[in-house]
Amino acid sequence: MRLLFLFCTLIGLQAANPDIEFAGPAPGKAQSQTQGDVVTLENNVLSASWEVRRGRLQPTTIVDKTSGAKVDQRGAELFRLSTTPVAMGDGSYQVEINLEDARVVVRAGPNGKSMQEIASFPRADFPGDPKLLRVGKMNLKAQAKDHAGEAGPAGEGRILEINPAPAGKTSFGFRGPANRATVSELPWAQGVRSLSARIDRGTDSALSWSPAVALVWEDGKTFLLVGVRDKRGTFNVTTAAGERMTSPKFTPFPAGDLTASAFSVVGEVRRLPLKDGQALEADLTSDRGVKARWRAELRDGSHYFRQTILLAAEGKPYELHGVEFADVRAPGLQQVGSCPGSPLAGAGLFAGVEMPGSANLVTPAGGRSAFSCSLTLSPEQSYDFGTVTGLAPAGQLRRSFLRYIERERARASSPFLHYNCWYDLGFGVDEPRMLDVVQAFDTELVKKRGVPVRSYLVDDGWDQPSKGLWVEHERKFPGGFAATKAKMNPFGAHLGIWISPLGGYGGDKERTAQAQKQGLIPADAKLDLSYPKYKQWFVDRCRQLMREGGVNAFKWDRAGDGVSPHFMALLDVARQLRKDDPAVFINVTVGTWPSPFWLNHVDSTWRMHSADVGWTGKGDDREKWLTFRDGYAHKLFVQAAPLYPLNSAMHHGVVHGRAFQGDKVGKAGNDLKNEVRSYFANGASLQELYLTPSMMTATAWDHVAASAKWAHAHADVLRDAHWVGGDPLKLEPYGYAAWNPRQATLMLRNPDDQPRTIELDADEVFDLPRATRTASPAFDLRSPYADQRLRELKLAAGTKVTVTLQPFEVLVFDTDSGR
């Protein structure tokens, strides 16, 4: 069966919400035209043209009609395919740290080749000389401390060629669990200004505890850590200010030896009317045995156009090792974000491949996006890839890109309020306990307070690996989820399910053995969706859970990473499940990174590379948790991926439980006011309640209900949620704001135990388009909460207003409360 891997949104899944505001004229209806050999898609704000010349299809121009800018695309390739693997060495990487006079520079390269600068810092941040060199596996604070959770699988690796070699030690080997520290601490000679070492991950599978080298200064708080996240060359460079992740390209993009210029157009370029726009389509063929169907689409009301290519082999199977499908000739383009799958932007445009694992190459001529892969094309097996190019009016890049995402994402964003059992029942989850939870939530939230609960998610611990692959535990769920569903039906309740495509954590070896026993994967293989039988089994099992268990949400954990056959199959599984239920919510956790292009396929991703629940800063354990929650959202989403919509971030929700980290937060008391008010104002559509009903008071339920209702009433504007203020990890006041022409919201929080001030200008706070700054400059904000100390706040564009926040105070405002 042909795998049709779509990067476009399924028909009928376009957002029912009003469009995000476009800072320019209304784009209007799409049109297409042919003039000689040139075909064009256009509307009121843009046009894009392609030309058939000597039988070859090539781009010619992009015109921004709002500014009159014309971007010449002649010489750009529609696509480039790689037919040979990209050589990346043996998976070990040379890293260098140089303490220059003005800067501290980090460089890296495969086996010492093609060394590139991957990070730099002011030398003033690292005064004097380091005191220690630490090598091995350590936490992100360069400390020899273990992860609080699962130890993870055992592995081994090495730090080699350490130079200079303190105490004559040039290498360090380790073997141990992935999430446990193994560190060698060595003295650092005064006056030494550089360090180099080769880091070989070997079989180690850690993420945050990846093999690393770290220089540590006298105060113990100043440090610089450089770790290798994976064999593909993802690095984490961490200081006291936070973590940076980067995936530099040490060699040119995938070779791109088969270009679109080598393909001939079969017949003519077809103009196709769509239900809500216009499309162009052409069939292309090459003498290399690969055929392609190119398509360009401009939907009505769009400020962007999309292109897709469907690739297949005409005869014998064809190995594909890379795809480049965004070549935009616009000087000034830059990558926006530090993670894989970051878009390009500049010169009034944004662009990118709709693939979360893509990488960018920026040149003086413009920017290109590509990804390496290992895929086999055949007449029966084809793949579809997509790219986008759009307009970004001055000062409105974030909102312009958000508008594109909201129009094209896999499922329209909307609040998905649900219960998750992890910090309540933990591994003790079973049917009786889940039914008790459903009854309690139905009584306290649904009936008493009028708050709908969309799902009750069963997290890890529900299956019985010794009895089969992802089968319900015979003691915990004796009648299977179908029986549980029948008992939940009177409440109108649905189940959500945690499941791992790669087998999860505890019990993963047994699950793998079960798959091998059933012939789903080879006898010596690990779980991997690229095996057709296992993939089909996984799809069928998820469908069965949806059909028989009434499951309306999946939490895919340990999902895998990198553009591989498994990765491609994973995204296709999501597509297939949406064919059965377009509203199914798919949250992907471990194995993701904050590329906004995930959202073309799934609904939300986790703030990977931080603890699930952690504590930092001041106050009690609940306030420290809030500072951790928002601090790492700021670091891992806002800073690492400025164009990732915060409405699609997984934060680990509201926590008041008795299991695992939930117990520590729960012991801080049941005053949830600050937590729920700050959480529901962040715009997240994945609204998680990790609550133990027996620990809740009537007041606690009231706070949850009031904030959830407020968020649901402001769901439209909260899609625009964006960051305001400083860094919570530095105890700076911060918040979230959202704006559209109809509403605005603002949340502020002080993470310090001392009063702190924050300056607010409506222009900056609400990220206002230029026209709005003059047409509607004033904002009369009021609080929806009667007990809030500051009930009203007036802001104006171009005028700074100083607000003083009391210790740990949370303030929430909107433009329609009390009207």
Q: Whereabouts are the PLM-identified features?
A:
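Active-site-proximal substrate-binding groove within the catalytic cores of carbohydrate-active enzymes
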Residues: 42-44, 55-57, 62, 380, ...
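Sec-dependent signal peptide recognition
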Residues: 1-6
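Extracellular glycan-recognition surfaces and repeat-rich motifs
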Residues: 125-170, 249, 253-262, 266-268
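Aromatic- and carboxylate-enriched substrate-binding clefts and catalytic-loop regions
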Residues: 453-656
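Beta-strand-rich N-terminal accessory domains
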Residues: 16-119, 161-163, 169-172, 196-204, ...
